[in-house]
């Protein structure tokens, strides 16, 4: 299967082959996810994650689908030990979406994800200048796409939709994820 990059003219998605391990992960994820979260909740009292709102020249927003969880999300992930949140969002963008930030990410909002994951906090950044680069998220990312904010896929999570509106339109952010 040919892999198309988001820098190719007229291409709205980066797609890759759906391999059997990815399908297997999607089938067992609903059962294993609560166990993994419970383990990390007791092992680490506080977790910090980052997400990025990135738009292209047409005003489309970058979203992605993971192989292990259903829905469309803003790119991002966890902040690693010894890493700043700003460094983490730049790293996650490159790893997951093949996007290299050319400008310093701007912090838009901070949220608690206490209801779903006690002790979890998420920082949302806006990246305005970027270029494509090689992604190394094989096995983790199923699909990457660019969507107009008013035409997001049906499977886009409610929190993702709220963060996009807050970041793009300057609306007051909800402190809860």
Model-derived features with residue positions:
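Acidic, metal-coordinating catalytic segment for phosphate/diphosphate chemistry
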Residues: 4, 10-51
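Structural detector for helix-capping/boundary residues
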Residues: 50, 77, 91-92, 147-150
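Conserved hydrophobic/aromatic beta-strand scaffold that supports enzyme active sites
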Residues: 53, 63, 124-126, 146
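Conserved Nudix-box catalytic region and its N-terminal flanking loop in Nudix hydrolases
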Residues: 56, 60-95
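A short coil-to-beta-strand element that immediately follows conserved catalytic motifs
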Residues: 100-109
């Amino acid at each position: 299967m040919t892999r198309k990059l988001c820098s190719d003219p007229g291409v709205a998605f980066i797609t890759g082959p759906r391999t059997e391990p990815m399908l297997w992960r999607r089938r067992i994820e609903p059962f294993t996810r609560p166990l993994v979260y419970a383990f990390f909740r007791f092992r680490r009292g506080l977790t910090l994650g980052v997400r990025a709102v990135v738009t292209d020249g047409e005003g489309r927003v970058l979203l992605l689908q993971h192989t292990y969880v259903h829905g469309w999300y803003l790119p991002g992930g966890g902040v690693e030990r010894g890493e700043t949140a700003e460094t983490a969002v730049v790293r996650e963008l490159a790893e997951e979406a093949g996007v290299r930030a050319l400008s310093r990410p701007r912090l838009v909002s901070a949220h608690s994800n206490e209801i779903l994951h006690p002790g979890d906090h998420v920082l949302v950044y806006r990246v305005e200048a970027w270029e494509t680069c090689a992604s190394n998220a094989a096995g983790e990312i199923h699909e990457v796409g660019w969507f107009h904010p008013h035409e997001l896929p049906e499977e886009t999570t409610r929190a993702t939709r709220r963060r996009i509106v807050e970041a793009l339109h300057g609306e007051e952010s909800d402190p809860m994820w």
